[in-house]
A protein has these predicted regions:
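Transmembrane helical elements of multi-pass membrane transporters/channels
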Residues: 20-39, 141, 175, 204-208, ...
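Helix-terminus/linker motif at the lipid-water interface of multi-pass membrane proteins
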Residues: 30, 34-53, 122-129, 185-192, ...
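Hydrophobic transmembrane alpha-helices of multi-pass small-molecule transporters
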Residues: 64-67, 111, 179-184, 209-213, ...
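N-terminal transmembrane alpha-helices
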Residues: 9-46, 60-75, 79, 104-111, ...
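Small-residue-rich hydrophobic transmembrane alpha-helices
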Residues: 52-112, 149-168, 276-339, 372-394
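Hydrophobic/aromatic residues within transmembrane alpha-helices of membrane transport systems
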Residues: 27, 39-43, 55, 80, ...
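Short runs within selected transmembrane alpha-helices of multi-pass transporters and secretion channels
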Residues: 73, 142-160, 168-176, 197-210, ...
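Short alpha-helical transmembrane segments in multi-pass integral membrane proteins
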Residues: 1-22, 80-145, 189-245, 301-368, ...
Length: 453
C-alpha cells in the first residue's frame, strides 16, 4: 500500500523526478505566500495604505518566526527521508514521533516568549507609533497560532520526505481560498480591521493541518505510529536537533537580516514601507521556483544519501543548477520590465509615489537572482546530505552583509542604497556554501576510489 502514495526518488531519471516533485512544491509555495498576500490585498484595498504598511511591515518578522518552525520541521524531515531511502521504516516512524515531540515543544515555548516580547520587538524594528496598535494586535494573534503552524509544517514535511509533494499543495489551495473568504468576511463585513487578517490566516492554516492529518491516517499506513514509536530517546533528539536547529537558525538568521532592512526602510516613512512591502510580496511569488527547487533537492538528496547513491546526488545537483540559471534569466526580465504592473495588485494606480518605491527595488536587485537561486540549491543539497552547520554559516554571512550595508546607508543615502543589502547578502551566502559542497563531493569521490582499490 505504501508504494501507491510514496515516491521513491532513488530510482528513475533524476531530471524527471525533480521536475515532477518541484512543480507541486512551487505551486504550494505560491499558495503559502498567498496567505499574507491575501491579507495585504484586502487590507490595502479596503483599509488603505496605513493598513497595508502595518501588515507589510510584519513580513520579515513573520518570516523570522514561521521560518524557524519551518526550518526545524524541514531539518527533522531530512532524517525521515534518509531512513525512508534506506528502507528502514521502523526507524523512520521513530524519528517521525520524536519530531512531533520537539516541534510541539518549540511552538509552545515560542508562543509564550513572543507574546511577552511582542511590543519590545516591534519598537526595535522602528515600527511607527501610529501603526503600533495594529501591528501589535496582528502579530499577537499570529503568535497564538504557532502550534497550528508547527503542526502543518511538520505533517507536510513528513509527506514531502516520502516523496509526496502534491497532497500538501491540495490542502494549501483549499485553505488559501478559505483565507480569502475569511479576510473579506472579517474585514469588509464584520469590520475587524487588521486583526481580522490575522484570524483568517490562523484559521486557514488550522484547516491545512487537519487535512494533512486526515490524509496521512487514510492514505499513508507507512506513517501510522505505534506506542513504541513514541518511546523517548535523547539520542534521537540529539540527531534531530543537530539538523533541525541549524536549519531553523539559518531561516531565523536570514530573517533577522530582513528585519534589519525593514527597520531601515521604516525610517523613510509609510510610503516607502508600503512600496517595499508590495515589492517584497511580488518578489516572493517569483522566487518560489527557487524555493521549490531547493526543497525538492532536500528530499531527493536525502533519499539518495540514505540509499548510498551519491552519483545520483551529484547528477541531480548539476541538472538542477542549470534549471535554476534558466529561471533566473526569465525572472530578471519579468521583474525589470513588468514589476511596475504587478504592483497594481496591491496598490492603486494613482499612488505613483508608492509604485515608484517598488520599481526602485526591482531595478536595484534584479541582476542578482542567479545568486539567490543558487543559495537554495546548495543550502538544501548540503542539508539533504546531513550537513547543517555550513548552511547556517551561509545565513550568518547573509546577516553580516545585510547589516553592513544598512549600517552605512540607512538614512544617509537614497532608498536604493538600502535595497542593495539584498544582493550583497545573496552573494555573501554563497561564499561558504559552494566551496564546501565541492569539498564534500570530492571527499566522497576519493573515498569511493579508495574503497574500489
Amino acid at each position: 500500500m505504501a508504494k501507491d502514495k510514496t515516491n521513491d526518488m532513488t530510482v528513475g531519471n533524476p531530471v524527471s523526478l525533480i521536475i515532477r516533485f518541484m512543480i507541486p512544491m512551487c505551486l504550494g509555495n505560491v499558495f503559502q505566500q498567498f496567505y499574507n498576500i491575501a491579507d495585504s490585498i484586502v487590507a490595502g484595498q479596503f483599509l488603505g495604505v496605513d493598513a497595508l504598511a502595518a501588515i507589510g511591515s510584519t513580513g520579515s518578522l513573520m518570516f523570522f518566526v514561521t521560518g524557524w518552525l519551518n526550518g526545524l520541521s524541514s531539518g527533522f524531515a531530512i532524517l525521515v527521508s534518509q531512513w525512508f531511502g534506506a528502507k528502514q521504516y521502523d526507524k523512520m516512524r521513530h524519528y517521525v514521533a520524536m519530531s512531533i515531540y520537539l516541534a510541539a515543544a518549540f511552538a509552545i515555548v515560542m508562543t509564550i516568549g513572543l507574546e511577552a516580547l511582542n511590543e519590545p520587538i516591534l519598537r526595535l524594528m522602528n515600527s511607527p507609533e501610529d501603526l503600533m496598535g495594529s501591528v501589535k494586535g496582528y502579530m499577537g494573534i499570529i503568535y497564538a497560532g504557532l502550534l497550528v503552524t508547527a503542526a502543518y509544517n511538520s505533517l507536510a514535511a513528513f509527506l514531502r520526505a516520502l516523496g509526496d509533494s502534491r497532497s500538501p499543495l491540495y490542502f494549501l489551495i483549499i485553505s488559501a481560498v478559505i483565507n480569502v473568504f475569511l479576510d473579506i468576511l472579517f474585514i469588509v463585513k464584520i469590520g475587524m480591521g487588521v486583526e481580522g487578517c490575522a484570524y483568517a490566516t490562523v484559521i486557514a492554516q488550522a484547516i491545512s493541518a487537519v487535512c494533512c492529518l486526515i490524509y496521512i491516517i487514510k492514505k499513508f499506513p507507512i506513517l501510522h505510529l505505534k506506542k513504541e514509536n513514541f518511546e523517548v530517546s535523547f539520542t534521537s533528539f540529539r540527531y534531530l536537533l543537530a539538523l533541525g536547529i541549524p536549519m531553523g537558525l539559518q531561516f531565523s538568521i536570514t530573517a533577522i537580516g530582513t528585519i534589519i532592512v525593514q527597520g531601515a526602510v521604516n525610517i523613510y516613512g509609510s510610503v516607502y514601507m508600503a512600496g517595499f512591502s508590495a515589492a517584497g510580496k511580488i518578489q516572493n511569488i517569483i522566487v518560489t521556483v527557487f524555493v521549490a527547487f531547493g526543497a525538492t533537492m532536500a528530499t531527493y538528496v536525502g533519499q539518495n544519501r540514505g540509499a548510498g547513491k551519491m552519483d545520483r546526488v551529484k547528477e541531480g545537483m548539476r541538472y538542477t543548477q542549470i534549471m535554476i540559471l534558466i529561471w533566473s534569466v526569465i525572472t530578471m526580465i519579468i521583474m525589470f520590465f513588468f514589476g511596475k504592473y504587478m504592483t497594481w495588485l496591491f496598490i492603486d494606480k494613482s499612488q505613483t509615489d508608492v509604485i515608484n518605491v517598488s520599481v526602485t527595488y526591482f531595478h536595484t536587485v534584479f541582476w542578482a537572482y542567479p545568486f539567490l537561486g543558487s543559495i537554495f540549491l546548495y543550502r538544501n543539497g548540503l542539508q539533504g546530505l546531513g550537513y547543517g552547520l555550513v548552511p547556517m554559516l551561509g545565513g550568518v554571512f547573509e546577516l553580516v552583509a545585510r547589516s553592513a550595508i544598512v549600517m552605512f546607508v540607512a538614512g544617509k543615502t537614497s532608498f536604493a542604497g538600502v535595497c542593495l543589502a539584498d544582493p550583497a547578502a545573496w552573494i555573501a551566502a554563497l561564499i561558504p556554501l559552494i566551496p564546501y559542497y565541492i569539498y564534500v563531493m570530492k571527499k566522497w569521490s576519493r573515498g569511493k576510489k579508495e574503497t574500489a582499490a
